[in-house]
Amino acid sequence: MNLRAKNASIALAGAALLALGLSACSGTAGATTEEDTATTAGYAVDAETLVFGVVPDSADTETNYQPLMDYIAQETGKTVEYHESTDYAALIEAAIAGKIDVASFSGFTYVTATNNGAELTPISSIVTEEGQEPGYFSQAIVPTASDIQSLADFAGKKVCFVDPSSTSGYLFPSYNLLEEGIDPETDVTPVFAGKHDVSVQKTGEGVECEAGFAEDSEVEKSDKVRIIEETMVPGAPLVYSNTLPDDVKDQLVGILAEVTIDDIIASGVDSADSDGFRSVFFETKPVDDAYYDLIRDICEKTDATQCQG
């Protein structure tokens, strides 16, 4: 199947609460009152704090998300605590354990987390340029001087992936390789770089990885690699924890479902008025759970272990 043609078709195509001292204690000094319980129930930490979880995409992840966190803090009146997991699996575990309140997931990470009991609801997906729809490209890359000309040439090579739970850095690449008759586990030597920028770096160096995969926003920063193929994947969701109080969930939807960078700047968040934030955020557009059915379909076709509940 021609992958360029397939790009168009693809483009169209229980959570446990963290124990926070809720059990009653004997004696008046340490007793937990009903009011205390009501204050902390449903939150990762407490009613004054929202924990914002992210996948570790690149070295600039926290800087990229800071203006959005500042905006959430301003609009909710709560402290927003940044939580960057060590890897995708750790973020999934944190979601299942109720340790995050709002988060930016990859599509695959969201599907994997909910398959395994995380109680999450998608709010929206970030788009980076005016006129775009949610979504971005998974790109197959090689060093600029490489003789590799197609995905078929990846067979037998050392190939950089991002993480076993990465949408554009593993799930869609696995599907594309399988379409070429290449098993991503046995017909290549997989190298998991951990982050998209590291996958690009290692591929560009051509030592640990002779080819690789990463999302387009990181690939475009490098002059050491060239693109072999690309596939559009569903946009990464901003999600909230279903355990939050209804009024807080409604507030997050109101804040994050449809907001532009100009809205955020106009609200008084000065940190949003920067080239760095403009490079990763233009606006959000609403998405729902059904939007990620394409990922579930790819999960079935690849039989990826990470998709299993």
Report the location of each language-model feature.
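A ligand-binding cleft/hinge motif common to bilobed small-molecule-binding domains
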Residues: S104-A118, N176-E179, Q201-E230
